[in-house]
């Protein structure tokens, strides 16, 4: 592939990221007008992210057949930070702030693409808007798709975004009603 074609591909990915960021910002603005309460917008962003995450889990597993099955939260954090987040957001992430028992940790995104071109007003943040909750919801949805129930919340700290993840339980496979083994 020629150098010019590679440069054009890189430029188109950057344009796509910028377009996504601006479109996301416009969508959140419209949601704030529709819902009026920033907490309700955060709930809706979480639901949207959850629905995206359930679909992204299948896509991720199809593209990454060599990723081992996770059996604990440290492995989950490792796969999220080394594979999933760089794959879908194009950024690096780190896991830290583990609680005793390894049931809760924080993923730090140092360059959140959603907040790259946006400055969220402080009064909306203090009123309960979590602008990056879409990402936390996507992580929650993806993990639920692979049978891990977690709680996830996002906090934008200005310089970076922190996603706090708390493990709740391993979900059991269940057959639809009326079907037995």
Swiss-Prot record:
Chaperone is among the record's keywords: no
Protein location: Golgi apparatus, cis-Golgi network; Endoplasmic reticulum
Gene: trpp-3
UniProt keyword annotations, A-Z: Endoplasmic reticulum, ER-Golgi transport, Golgi apparatus, Lipoprotein, Palmitate, Transport
Swiss-Prot/TrEMBL GO biological process terms: cuticle development involved in collagen and cuticulin-based cuticle molting cycle; endoplasmic reticulum to Golgi vesicle-mediated transport; intra-Golgi vesicle-mediated transport; multicellular organism growth; protein secretion
Protein name: Trafficking protein particle complex subunit 3 homolog
GO cellular component: cis-Golgi network membrane; cytosol; endoplasmic reticulum; TRAPP complex
Entry keyword annotation includes Signal: no
Organism lineage string: Eukaryota, Metazoa, Ecdysozoa, Nematoda, Chromadorea
Role description: May play a role in vesicular transport from endoplasmic reticulum to Golgi. Required for the systemic spread of the RNAi response.
Lipidation feature positions (S-palmitoyl cysteine): 70
Self-association state and partner proteins as the record states: Homodimer. Part of the multisubunit TRAPP (transport protein particle) complex.
Main location: Golgi
Family: Belongs to the TRAPP small subunits family. BET3 subfamily.
PANTHER family referenced in this protein's UniProt entry, alphabetically: TRAFFICKING PROTEIN PARTICLE COMPLEX SUBUNIT 3 (PTHR13048)
Domain of life assignment: Eukaryota
Originating species: Caenorhabditis elegans
Xref: InterPro entries: Bet3 (IPR016721), NO_sig/Golgi_transp_ligand-bd (IPR024096), TRAPP_component (IPR007194)
